[in-house]
Design a protein with these regions (language model features):
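Short, basic/glycine-rich phosphate-binding loops at helix/coil junctions
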Residues: 1
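Active-site-proximal beta-alpha core segment in soluble small-molecule metabolic enzymes
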Residues: 4, 9-12, 29-138
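Nucleotide phosphate-binding/pyrophosphate-handling subdomain across enzymes
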Residues: 16-33
């Protein structure tokens, strides 16, 4: 066999994904253990991975972009318990706040401008708005 006749095969052990989540969850005890499903679950397919994590008790999920949040919400729409979807790279375009609020997406705010926009939106509608804030100050 030469290099031109070889190919790669990737086998994904879905039971190992479930087992790894259970193990990580056991390490954090009563803290939240979230699943990170960005980039279509790192190429494994959000429609296959999200239900596995959900069935293991995962209710908090991080995605990279809003379109991934929509896809995740659709995949898990038939499940009974509420899920929390955190979006790492929000669009931050005019009107994004209404969209996130309507779909119950939780933004990960990466700069003070986004923090102020989200805070102002909450004041406008008289609600406290959930968010994760990651600010790196130099």
């Amino acid at each position: 066999m030469n290099a031109f006749n070889t190919y790669s095969v990737l086998n994904i052990d879905l039971d190992a994904i479930a087992s790894n989540y259970r193990y990580l969850r056991s390490l954090v005890n009563s803290s939240i253990c979230a699943g990170v499903l960005k980039a279509d679950s790192y190429g494994l397919g959000i429609e296959g991975i999200a239900p596995i994590l959900y069935n293991e008790g995962c209710r908090h999920f991080f995605v990279a972009y809003t379109n991934e949040a929509v896809a995740l919400k659709n995949v898990l729409s038939t499940f009974q318990q509420k899920i929390h979807i955190y979006v790492l790279n929000g669009p931050y375009l005019k009107g994004w706040e209404d969209y996130y609020h309507h779909h119950q997406f939780i933004p990960v705010l990466n700069d003070l401008e986004a923090v102020h926009e989200w805070q102002s939106y909450g004041k406008e509608i008289s609600q406290k708005m959930p968010a994760v804030c990651i600010l790196t100050l130099a």
